[in-house]
Structure formats: C-alpha cells, structure tokens
C-alpha cells in the first residue's frame, strides 16, 4: 500500500442487528525475538469500534499457546465492551458477546475440562476463558461465546502480520474503510453518516 500511504480513510457504520462481534488471531513467533503477535477487532453496527495489535509478553512454544493468549486478552476486552455498551443502552443486557477464533486446539484447551500436562503455565488463562465463555449458574449468561471460524474468514488476520497487497485489500474492505477524497469536514459529513476519523 506504499502508493496509497498518504490517502486518508474513514470508518463507515450502518444500521445493523450486530450487537457485538469480535475476532481474535495470533501470528506465531513472527517477531525477531520469536514472540508472537496478537490481533483483535470488535465490530458494532457494521464497523470496528475497538482493535488491538501487540507483541505478546511471553514466548509461546506452540501456535496453540499463542492463540490462547490472544483469546484470553480478547475475552478481557469483551468483558469491558459488553459492560460499557450495556450501561449506555447500546446493546441488550445479558447477551453474550461473540468471539471468532480459528484455532481448534486453542478452543479445545480453553473450553474443555481436560487436563493438559504440557500447558500448566497457561492454566490461568485457560481457566479465565472457560469461566467467562461457558454457561454459568442457571439464569446467568457467560460474558462471551467462542465460535470456531475458518481461517479465510478471520477478520483480525491483518492485525497480526504483514499481508500481500491483495490480502490487505480484503482486510481493508472487511473493516469497512473508505478512501477520503475530499478536503473539508462539511463534505465528509455529507457523504457518510458516521465518520469517526479523518486527517
């Protein structure tokens, strides 16, 4: 995207029944010191309202562990966003957030009661995800539900690693960014209903 680096973009939102959908991913050992990179994005009303991309503090020894770290951080963000939106009246009270994860091993480790002898040092994260994503006592709902999603539909992929131009365009379209080809804020307000960023 070198040729477009100076083109500003806006985020577009539209009326939608989506009341909170999140995607999380991890790029295993992609940094120079073999640390993995976590990526997370949360969508509301057709556009992203929260996102993150950061190098993990721990060195993971497998893709599964790096994905579990990313999933645990996403659950923390889901808890915060859900409480905020409920307090603002922007989403129904008691409805779990939806988190999309593409790694089946991480999902099994996070949601199963099985004991994983080689993952004891990740047990706290495992327990945190399980506690917040499984049905609680009768009448209570979990913070979020985790859904296994095919890798090609993982919308946080662009937040974990560099993509080819074609894949980046797919990611860009997925997060509903639109080129801003006008000079004034007034024109911006006339062409999009909910601009949240310009430069």
Go through each PLM region and give its residues.
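Eukaryotic intrinsically disordered and solvent-exposed regulatory patches
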Residues: 6-10, 27-29, 57, 84-85
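Structured nucleic-acid-interacting core domains from mobile-element enzymes and related host factors
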Residues: 1-26, 90
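Short gly/pro-enriched beta-turn/loop segments at secondary-structure junctions
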Residues: 15-17, 35-37, 92-94
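RNase H-like nuclease fold core
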Residues: 19-64
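Beta-strand cores of modular interaction/reader domains in eukaryotic scaffold and signaling proteins
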Residues: 12, 23, 43, 100, ...
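RNase H-like nuclease module associated with reverse transcription
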Residues: 19, 54-199
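Conserved helix-loop functional segments at active or binding sites
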Residues: 3-7, 48-51, 80, 84-87
């Amino acid at each position: 995207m070198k040729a477009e680096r100076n083109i500003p973009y806006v985020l577009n939102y539209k009326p939608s029944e989506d009341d909170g959908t999140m995607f999380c991913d991890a790029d295993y050992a992609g940094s120079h010191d073999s640390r993995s990179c976590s990526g997370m994005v949360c969508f509301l009303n057709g556009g992203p309202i929260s996102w993150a991309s950061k190098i993990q503090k721990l060195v993971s020894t497998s893709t599964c562990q790096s994905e579990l770290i990313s999933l645990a951080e996403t659950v923390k963000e889901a808890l915060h966003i859900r409480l905020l939106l409920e307090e603002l009246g922007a989403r129904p009270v008691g409805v779990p957030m939806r988190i999309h994860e593409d790694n089946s091993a991480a999902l099994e480790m996070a949601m199963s009661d099985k004991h994983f002898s080689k993952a004891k040092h990740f047990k706290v994260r495992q327990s945190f995800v399980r506690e917040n994503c499984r049905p609680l006592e009768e009448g209570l709902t979990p913070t979020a539900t985790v859904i296994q999603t095919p890798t090609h539909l993982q919308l946080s992929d662009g937040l974990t690693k560099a993509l080819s131009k074609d894949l980046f365009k797919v990611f860009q379209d997925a997060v509903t960014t639109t080129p801003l080809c006008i000079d004034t804020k007034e024109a911006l307000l006339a062409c999009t209903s909910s601009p949240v960023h310009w430069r």
